[in-house]
């Protein structure tokens, strides 16, 4: 039978040294391992985790923090902007021209029917992503120059 390798076949007789795998961090936290390290004089650092195991939300820097005292001192109510009347009327008009129900529109823009109802009733806080989806499906401008 011919060999796949041209020339003489040689053996690899160099020794292969197998090492034990490094200890995992879980094993290093074991009290036995910590006590053994202390007996050998190795420096051991122990750190207690802060709020470990609790279900508290961390403070995010992305969301602005509103001081409740400042809110109480303000005379103006902190109300969010709602959908303008002309926008909600354009949504209703364009939807009815296409002979779509609110559920059909909601299904096409991948939103709940309640979202479409809120936009048409003027109760929704304008979301650019939702308005863009509605513009695409209805074929009407709802942002900027409305109705064109």
Curated annotation (Swiss-Prot):
Induction: By abscisic acid, H(2)O(2), heat treatment, dehydration and high salt, but not by cold treatment, 2,4-D, ACC, methyl jasmonate or salicylic acid. Residues 91-145 form the HTH cro/C1-type domain. It comes from Arabidopsis thaliana. One of its GO terms (molecular function) is DNA-binding transcription factor activity. PANTHER family: ENDOTHELIAL DIFFERENTIATION-RELATED FACTOR 1, ENDOTHELIAL DIFFERENTIATION-RELATED FACTOR 1 MULTIPROTEIN BRIDGING FACTOR 1. This is Multiprotein-bridging factor 1c. It comes from the Eukaryota. Residues 102-121 bind DNA. Expressed in leaves, roots, stems, flowers, siliques and shoots. Not detected in seeds. Coiled coil: none annotated. Keywords: Activator, Cytoplasm, DNA-binding, Nucleus, Transcription, Transcription regulation. It is found in: Nucleus, Nucleolus; Cytoplasm. Disruption phenotype: Plants are deficient in basal thermotolerance. One of its GO terms (biological process) is positive regulation of DNA-templated transcription. One of its GO terms (cellular component) is nucleolus. SUPFAM superfamilies: lambda repressor-like DNA-binding domains. Transcriptional coactivator that stimulates transcriptional activity by bridging regulatory proteins and TBP, thereby recruiting TBP to promoters occupied by DNA-binding regulators. Involved in the tolerance to heat and osmotic stress by partially activating the ethylene-response signal transduction pathway. The lineage of its organism: Eukaryota, Viridiplantae, Streptophyta, Embryophyta, Tracheophyta. Pfam families: HTH_3, MBF1.
